[in-house]
Every structure is written in structure tokens, then in C-alpha cells.
């Protein structure tokens, strides 16, 4: 029995190495070893009777409903041309500075991550749109391909993210808390990308040139760039956000009719950002409708292109953070919002809906098949005490929490070369989560850390999925540029691989930062005070004892009068000859002390 769990795990690896689909490998391995265990007498015959109930439990999991809604939202936005507009507009904003196109790709990647959340869609969209432009104006090929692949993988860590939804479900934690924990690491990683591009632009200016003047599309009639009005609009929006954040308690007092002294930080942030975005949109809309001429073409373009996706992000994340909606409800509203945006842009039609629904159905079916297979495997694996084997294997690693985290991250890093994040989440995470919890590791921290690790594996050559996505759309033959008429050489696979190396190093630095500074994840979470069971036990033991026994009965209590009935014998409900309580009452008086029972239960729990 002790060797059955490792043999079963090795059997799963053999199934996967033979090339069978992961879902069927999991299910077949679970059924095979389950029936073998029953035949050998290692497992009870009733074990498999629990399988239908577990599968129905999957179907009733409301958290997993967020997956099709989120996928549908991302696909509608991606196919409605939002990425093209964002890249064109932000590219014009940052174009005049060295490295401007690379900065635009990073920021658009972050926005697409917060709206579509699909790595393949982000990488392919930016590869089709921005790579030809970057090659046209002389960007280094390794820098261009690396920044596109790295920015596309931000969809793994920036909320809302499919990876974080599944992590929360498998680790038994709130999706909202997982989103909050991933916010700071996502922004830090984006900042590290920006810092690297800025360093390259300063040290090697020829690798990241600025856009030439003739490539800048949005200019005023007098030839000016239009930046001053954009800066003024941003300043007004910033002032509105600061005002709302500082006076949120006063606003609540005015609305509710009684004094409110404190407002949650999440509410302040969401309300302030929403207010700033709405004010900017109203100013731009009023300027266009009334033809006031207060804003430049660039300022208007930036406002009307950026505001809709930002509002959609606030609709999804804001409602989740404020507790107005569950993650499933928030993402469902996001899908409806994406459809409304596509309608307003005139891009929603039956062809787009069919493509989006078809892709959503395929992904949802893929996830459900893997989850059912993982359920079969985990049922049998738990039956043979597999989790205890994994726990003993990992808790004996040197270094405590840090040693465990380093070993697990190395393992996940290499497994992610061959397995998709869905497969890793359903196979490996349920085995590692209980061990991390036993070691005292915060599971939100653990989940975000593994999500960043999986993001790193998306880019590691030669197995990174993001590199394959980019290779599929990067030019592999020499072609003539339509704008300049120049002959552009092809992008080689080795250029894509070498371009990803600096960003893999940046992501590994981010993993190390999260391991040694968990406050980057847990700092923004609501603090939950843990109960020290030893302190509770000591407190109960030191409390003055209470007498919970029945009070003594008066003499003659319960005895019939001599003139109405014969005396009853003791033991038949009458008092004993000395006037004490009956035997049944004496047994009740000897019952264990409830306080002692609580102490015994706590001691047993600590064991």
C-alpha cells in the first residue's frame, strides 16, 4: 500500500509521455489503478460509487462558470478590433520618444490582459499589428519579438485572469482575494518591462528608435503635436480622482444622511478611478458635440479609445472588489459590456458571435474534460493515501518554507514546458496546496507565485507557448513594406528565442521577489487573525472550574406518600432510602464536564 501512490503517479507520467491527451490520461490512470487497487484489496469496492457525486459537484461549481463568460468577453473584444485601435493610438502617444513603440506594446499588453485575459489572443494580435511597424522603423528584431511575447503573457497575472480563477478554485480561496493579491506583482512586472526598454533605448538608441515625423498621424492644423491639451485633460482627471478619494467619507455622509467616518480603501480606489474616467469622457464628448475646439485630435482620440476598455475593467474588477457581485457575476457583466462595446463600434455581427461562441465552447469543453479526468485521478490517489506521500516527500525538504517554495517553483517551471496551465492547475496544485497550507504558507501568496512562474514558462525557449504563437504570425520570408517600399528580411526563430531571454530573466527576478517578500501579495489583503490553539487551550485550563452537575434533591423528593402507594424500590425512579437522587440522576450527575470536553477536543485537534 505504501508504494501504490508513487507507482500510480509514475503511471500517469508514462501515459503523458506516450502522447495521450491529458484529460484521458488522468481518467484512464485513475480507473486502471482504482480497479487494480480494488482487486488487490487495497481499496474498498464502494470507492468508485463516490465518483458520480464528485462529477456532479464539478457541474455545480459556480466559480467555474466564470471561465466561459471570461473567454467570451475576451474573444469578442479581440475580434472587434480593440487591440488595433489601442496599439495605433498609444503608439502615436509614445512614438516621438525613443522606445515609444515598445512602451506602447507593453501598455497595450497590460490593457489586453485586463480585458481579454487570453495569452494567445494578446500575442497574436500584437504580433500581427505592431511587429511590422516596429520592423519598418528599424527596431532590433530581438527586442521587438521579446517585448511582444512578454507583454502578451501579462494576461497570466494581471486580473481578471483565467489562471487566477482556477488557482482560487483549486486552493479553496476567494477569487477576489486572489485578484487583489496579483495586482501589485502585475504592476511591478509591467514596470520592470518598461525599465528594461528604457535602459535599452538609452544605452543602445539604434535598437529602439523614435517614430519619424512623417509617421505621426495626429497633428493639429498648425502643425503642433496636441500634447498640451492631453496633459491638461489628464491633470483634470487626476485632480478629480484625488478629490473623490479624499472626500469619499463626506460623499457617503451626504448620500446616506448620517455621518460616515471611514470608507474601505478598495471603494476609494474604484470610485476615484471611475470618476476620473467619466469626467475625461464627458469633457471629450462635450467638446466634440459642441465643437468647442478645446481638445486636440490626439487628446480626443486617446480619450475615446482608452475610456471604453477602462470602464469595462472597472465594471468587472470594481464590482468584485466592492462585493457588489461575485466573480462569476462580474465576468458575466463584462461579457455583456463587451457585446455592447462591439455594437457601438459597429463590429458585432453573426459571424463574430459564431466564432467567439465556438472558441468559448471548445475551451470550456477542454477545461471540463481535464477537470473530470483530474477528479477520477484524485479520487483514487486520495484513496491510496497519495496526499500523505506527497506531504512527507515535500515537508522533509531542507530550508522550511523557502526551501519548499524554491523546489516547487523549479518543478512547476519545468513541468510548464510540456503542460498547459489548466493541466498544471488541475493535476499538481491540488497536491501542493495542502502541503503549503501545513507549512504555514498563505495560499493566496502561493497561488500568485505559481501564476507568475507559469507565466515565465510561457516564454522560456524552446518550449514557450507564447514563442510558438509569435512564430506563427511573424514573417518567415522576405517581404516588401507597403508604406516605405523597403524589402524587410524575415524574422528567424533564433531571433525570437534570444529576444525572450532578457524577459525570462526579469520574470525569474519577479519570482524571487515574491518568494522573499510575500508582503507584495498579502499586503493589500484583509487581515484575518489566526487563532492560536495552544493559547485557547491554556486559557480554558486556567479558567475557574464550574459545577455543571444536577443540584442535590431535597429529602423525600420523588417518593410517594405512605398513605397512597407502596414504597418503590430504589432503581425504579424513586429516591433512595437516604433521600438522595435516583440512580438515573446520579448517572447524569457523573456526566463529563462540558468544559473538559472542549479542552480534550482542542488537544486532539492540535495532534
Locations of the language-model features?
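Alpha-helical transmembrane segments of multi-pass membrane transport proteins
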Residues: 1-607
Amino acid at each position: 500500500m505504501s508504494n501504490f501512490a508513487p507507482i500510480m503517479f509514475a503511471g500517469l507520467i508514462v501515459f503523458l509521455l506516450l502522447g495521450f491527451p491529458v484529460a484521458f490520461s488522468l481518467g484512464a490512470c485513475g480507473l486502471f489503478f482504482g480497479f487494480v487497487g480494488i482487486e488487490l484489496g487495497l481499496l474498498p469496492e464502494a470507492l468508485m460509487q463516490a465518483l458520480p457525486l464528485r462529477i456532479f459537484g464539478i457541474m455545480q461549481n459556480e466559480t467555474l462558470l466564470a471561465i466561459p463568460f471570461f473567454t467570451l468577453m475576451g474573444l469578442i473584444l479581440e475580434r472587434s478590433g480593440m487591440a488595433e485601435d489601442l496599439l495605433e493610438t498609444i503608439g502615436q502617444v509614445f512614438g516621438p520618444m525613443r522606445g515609444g513603440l515598445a512602451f506602447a506594446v507593453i501598455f497595450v499588453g497590460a490593457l489586453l490582459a485586463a480585458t481579454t485575459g487570453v495569452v494567445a489572443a494578446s500575442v497574436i494580435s500584437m504580433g500581427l499589428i505592431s511587429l511590422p511597424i516596429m520592423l519598418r522603423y528599424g527596431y532590433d528584431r530581438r527586442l521587438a519579438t521579446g517585448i511582444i511575447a512578454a507583454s502578451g503573457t501579462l494576461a497570466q497575472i494581471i486580473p481578471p485572469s483565467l489562471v487566477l480563477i482556477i488557482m482560487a478554485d483549486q486552493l479553496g480561496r476567494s477569487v477576489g482575494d486572489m485578484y487583489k493579491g496579483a495586482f501589485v506583482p502585475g504592476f511591478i512586472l509591467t514596470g520592470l518591462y518598461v525599465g528594461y526598454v528604457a535602459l535599452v533605448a538609452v544605452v543602445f538608441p539604434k535598437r529602439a528608435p523614435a517614430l519619424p515625423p512623417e509617421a505621426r498621424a495626429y497633428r493639429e492644423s498648425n502643425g503642433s503635436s496636441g500634447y498640451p491639451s492631453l496633459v491638461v485633460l489628464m491633470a483634470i482627471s487626476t485632480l478629480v480622482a484625488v478629490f473623490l478619494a479624499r472626500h469619499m467619507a463626506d460623499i457617503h455622509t451626504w448620500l446616506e444622511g448620517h455621518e460616515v467616518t471611514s470608507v474601505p480603501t478598495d471603494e476609494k480606489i474604484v470610485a476615484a478611478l471611475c470618476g476620473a474616467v467619466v469626467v475625461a469622457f464627458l469633457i471629450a464628448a462635450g467638446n466634440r458635440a459642441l465643437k468647442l475646439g478645446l481638445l486636440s485630435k490626439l487628446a480626443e482620440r486617446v480619450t475615446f479609445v482608452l475610456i471604453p476598455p477602462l470602464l469595462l475593467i472597472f465594471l468587472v474588477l470594481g464590482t468584485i472588489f466592492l462585493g457588489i457581485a461575485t466573480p462569476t457575476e462580474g465576468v458575466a457583466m463584462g461579457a455583456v459590456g463587451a457585446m455592447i462595446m462591439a455594437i457601438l463600434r459597429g463590429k458585432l455581427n453573426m459571424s463574430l458571435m459564431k466564432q467567439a461562441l465556438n472558441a468559448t465552447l471548445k475551451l470550456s469543453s477542454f477545461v471540463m474534460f481535464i477537470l473530470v479526468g483530474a477528479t477520477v485521478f484524485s479520487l483514487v490517489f486520495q484513496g491510496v493515501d497519495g496526499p500523505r506521500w506527497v506531504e512527507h516527500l515535500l515537508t522533509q525538504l531542507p530550508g522550511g518554507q523557502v526551501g519548499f517554495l524554491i523546489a516547487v517553483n523549479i518543478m512547476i517551471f519545468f513541468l510548464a514546458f510540456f503542460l498547459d496551465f489548466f493541466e498544471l492547475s488541475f493535476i499538481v496544485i491540488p497536491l501542493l496546496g495542502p502541503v503549503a497550507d501545513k507549512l504555514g504558507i498563505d495560499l493566496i501568496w502561493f497561488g500568485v507565485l505559481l501564476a507568475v512562474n507559469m507565466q515565465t514558462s510561457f516564454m522560456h525557449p524552446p518550449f514557450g507557448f507564447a514563442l510558438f504563437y509569435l512564430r506563427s504570425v511573424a514573417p518567415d520570408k522576405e517581404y516588401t513594406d507597403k508604406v516605405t517600399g523597403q524589402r524587410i528580411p524575415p524574422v528567424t526563430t533564433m531571433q525570437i528565442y534570444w529576444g525572450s531571454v532578457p524577459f525570462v530573466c526579469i520574470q525569474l527576478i519577479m519570482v524571487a521577489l515574491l518568494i522573499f517578500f510575500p508582503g507584495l501579495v498579502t499586503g493589500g489583503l484583509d487581515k484575518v487573525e489566526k487563532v492560536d490553539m495552544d493559547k485557547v487551550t491554556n486559557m480554558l485550563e486556567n479558567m475557574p472550574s464550574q459545577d455543571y452537575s444536577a443540584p442535590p434533591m431535597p429529602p423525600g423528593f420523588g417518593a410517594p406518600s405512605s398513605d397512597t402507594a407502596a414504597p418503590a424500590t430504589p432503581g425504579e425512579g424513586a429516591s433512595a432510602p437516604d433521600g438522595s437522587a435516583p440512580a438515573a440522576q446520579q448517572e447524569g450527575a457523573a456526566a463529563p464536564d462540558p468544559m473538559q470536553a472542549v479542552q480534550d477536543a482542542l488537544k486532539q485537534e492540535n495532534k
